[in-house]
């Protein structure tokens, strides 16, 4: 495990001092994707129809062969705030890969950064040797070298990709993007937006924390973060410190007034894909409209009902797709409703074409949060609490300060000493996860599989069958989930607050008899956290 300098000590000291170029891929940069020759081929006609509904704020790549280059670039969060970012293809987020269900895709990763990198396909059940985990499924890709990922995309939905090499720092610097697998029988919408949410630090003196091995890297900044100067954070929990460290919230690499609006027309059916690439949960509110949550982590909700004036809490690593009909003309703000200092900077305008009305947002901070375990219509799922399981496993998730540094444990151990979950191919597996941390939230992510959530705090799930790959567990909560061991390999099972993962909250699902198809390269500093 990586050695860390105690975060409270670093924060106290620091804050006191602080007074896609492949011929088989189609590029659709910016907002203008309508200049394709619709008469050339049937494929181009399909792309033209798709471009009418997509309104991306980043490059969208289609096809089945892609090139992603990891490199350093400057990111303008707004007119006054510039960051040195690590990127795929020079942007944060990186390009969206838009692919069709059933296709085999190939992604060439070129590394132009000074450190090794990988790509992990978050949520996609890829073969084990394509999962992008340094030292577990491959060696990290060294500077000036390349690696080719190739796999079939069978499960439609909203996913994202990010580096899993020293992810606590590399993802924090911007090394991520989105991937959408379109179903064969996709129900059409008029507009299809993707919003990738993240947080950034203001104080560039915290960059020292990165080189010192802190759990949360810093970014360069353009202004002084003096409001938190002289603040003593010693004794604070991770949950208390994080919002004070990350005070700039972003959507698609922009913050505040620089966030580009989502343009709609009255009567249009609109889908918004929300992806949380950051460390903090985001409670998002869509004012003035009823909406349905059609999927979570890419997996459909059964008969989702319309809801209004409820907050959608999106934890790190989670994805939610929502749909609404644009039937209330004006200019609205899809905004964050948390008490975090950075919340005010995350408000995405939804603007009706041709309307000049003033921006509208709800000032109420007391709106209820959607309970996704009670949302949607109940139906028979793949698993139940009454099934017979081949393997049962308990994960006690906790925070430990007993050795003078904050660590995050599974069953009292930190990775790589956490006990693995040993399975055989075909096993039915039931896992109980309990968050015993007094204040810290743990969004637990399983690689290579989806799991079905069976119960929460001892009560069976009452809404739609809930299938996820990332589950947000609040302090004191207990969940039981189940999955089938149907994808042989060695798979990470970890907290997607990557600071918690880097400080120990990781384990592995290990298949009996499986042997990786690579040899550890001793010249590569593989860092799977």
How would you label these PLM feature ranges?
Residues 28, 69-182, 281-312, 332-344, ...:
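Histidine- and aromatic-enriched segments that form or immediately flank copper-ligand environments
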């Amino acid at each position: 495990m990586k050695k860390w300098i105690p975060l409270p000590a670093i924060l106290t000291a620091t804050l006191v001092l602080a007074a896609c170029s492949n011929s088989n891929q189609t590029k659709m940069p910016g907002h203008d994707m309508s200049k394709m020759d619709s008469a050339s081929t049937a494929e181009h006609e399909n792309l033209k129809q798709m471009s009418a509904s997509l309104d991306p704020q980043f490059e969208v790549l289609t096809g089945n062969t892609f090139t992603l280059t990891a490199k350093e670039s400057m990111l303008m969060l707004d007119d006054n705030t510039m960051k040195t970012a690590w990127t795929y293809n020079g942007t944060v987020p990186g390009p969206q890969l838009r692919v069709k269900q059933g296709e085999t895709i190939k992604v060439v990763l070129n590394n132009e950064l000074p450190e090794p990198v990988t790509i992990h396909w978050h949520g996609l059940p890829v073969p084990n040797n394509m999962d992008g985990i340094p030292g577990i499924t491959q060696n990290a890709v060294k500077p000036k070298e390349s690696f080719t990922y190739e796999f079939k995309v069978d499960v439609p939905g909203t996913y994202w990709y990010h580096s899993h090499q020293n992810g606590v720092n590399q993802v924090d610097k911007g090394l991520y993007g989105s991937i959408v697998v379109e179903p064969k029988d996709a129900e059409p919408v008029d507009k299809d937006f993707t919003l990738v949410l993240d947080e950034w630090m203001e104080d560039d003196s915290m960059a020292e924390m990165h080189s010192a091995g802190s759990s949360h890297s810093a970014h360069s900044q353009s202004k002084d973060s003096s409001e938190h100067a002289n603040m003593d954070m010693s004794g604070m929990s991770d949950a208390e410190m994080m919002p004070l460290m990350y005070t700039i919230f972003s959507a698609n690499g922009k913050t505040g007034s620089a966030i580009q609006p989502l343009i709609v027309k009255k009567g249009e059916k609109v889908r918004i894909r929300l992806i949380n690439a950051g460390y903090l949960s985001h409670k998002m509110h869509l004012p003035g409209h009823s909406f349905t949550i059609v999927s979570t982590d890419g997996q459909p909700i059964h008969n989702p009902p319309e809801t209004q004036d409820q907050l959608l809490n999106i934890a790190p690593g989670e994805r939610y797709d929502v749909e609404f009909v644009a039937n209330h003309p004006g200019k609205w703000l899809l905004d964050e409703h948390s008490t975090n200092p950075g919340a005010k900077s995350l408000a995405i305008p939804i603007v009706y074409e041709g309307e000049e009305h003033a921006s509208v947002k709800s000032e109420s901070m007391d709106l209820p949060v959607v309970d996704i375990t009670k949302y949607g219509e109940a139906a028979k799922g793949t698993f139940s609490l009454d099934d017979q399981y081949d393997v049962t496993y308990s994960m006690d998730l906790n925070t430990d300060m007993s050795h003078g540094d904050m660590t995050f444990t599974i069953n009292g151990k930190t990775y790589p000493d956490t006990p693995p979950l040993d399975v055989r191919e075909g096993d039915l597996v039931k896992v109980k996860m309990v968050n015993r941390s007094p204040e810290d939230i743990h969004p637990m992510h399983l690689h290579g599989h989806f799991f079905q959530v069976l119960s929460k705090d001892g009560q069976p799930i009452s809404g739609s069958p809930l299938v996820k790959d990332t589950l947000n567990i609040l302090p004191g909560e207990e969940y039981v989930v189940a999955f089938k061991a149907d994808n042989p390999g060695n798979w990470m099972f970890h907290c997607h607050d990557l600071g918690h993962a880097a400080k120990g909250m990781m384990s592995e699902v290990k298949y009996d008899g499986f042997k990786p198809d690579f040899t550890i390269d001793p010249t590569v500093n593989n860092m799977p956290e």
